[in-house]
């Protein structure tokens, strides 16, 4: 970043970040554009994700709610802490 500014996530190990946010609300966006919001329960080295209290959003509209949701890692575009 310019002028010596650093971003909050710069230099942070992604696996460390993910282990820190387990149990917290996250947003998971898939390559298809579908978004899941829920409580992160686990994530593995392949980015396979388990969520609880999950809501599914398609084009910004809530479509479904799930107790548990499992997302295969190769479908994940990003995970962000809420």
Curated annotation (Swiss-Prot):
It is found in: Cytoplasm; Nucleus. Its main location: cytoplasm. GO terms for molecular function: RNA binding. InterPro entries: Lsm6/sSmF, LSM_dom_sf, Sm, Sm_dom_euk/arc. GO terms for biological process: deadenylation-dependent decapping of nuclear-transcribed mRNA; maturation of SSU-rRNA; mRNA splicing, via spliceosome; tRNA processing. Residues 13-82 form the Sm domain. One of its GO terms (cellular component) is sno(s)RNA-containing ribonucleoprotein complex. Keywords: Cytoplasm, mRNA processing, mRNA splicing, Nucleus, Ribonucleoprotein, RNA-binding, rRNA processing, Spliceosome, tRNA processing. PROSITE patterns: SM. Component of LSm protein complexes, which are involved in RNA processing and may function in a chaperone-like manner, facilitating the efficient association of RNA processing factors with their substrates. Component of the cytoplasmic LSM1-LSM7 complex, which is thought to be involved in mRNA degradation by activating the decapping step in the 5'-to-3' mRNA decay pathway. Component of the nuclear LSM2-LSM8 complex, which is involved in splicing of nuclear mRNAs. Component of the heptameric LSM1-LSM7 complex, which consists of snr-1/lsm1, snr-2/lsm2, snr-3/lsm3, snr-4/lsm4, snr-5/lsm5, snr-6/lsm6 and snr-7/lsm7. Component of the heptameric LSM2-LSM8 complex, which consists of snr-2/lsm2, snr-3/lsm3, snr-4/lsm4, snr-5/lsm5, snr-6/lsm6, snr-7/lsm7 and snr-8/lsm8. The LSm subunits form a seven-membered ring structure with a doughnut shape. Belongs to the snRNP Sm proteins family. SmF/LSm6 subfamily. PANTHER family: SMALL NUCLEAR RIBONUCLEOPROTEIN F SNRNP-F, U6 SNRNA-ASSOCIATED SM-LIKE PROTEIN LSM6. This is U6 snRNA-associated Sm-like protein LSm6. It comes from Neurospora crassa (strain ATCC 24698 / 74-OR23-1A / CBS 708.71 / DSM 1257 / FGSC 987). The lineage of its organism: Eukaryota, Fungi, Dikarya, Ascomycota, Pezizomycotina.
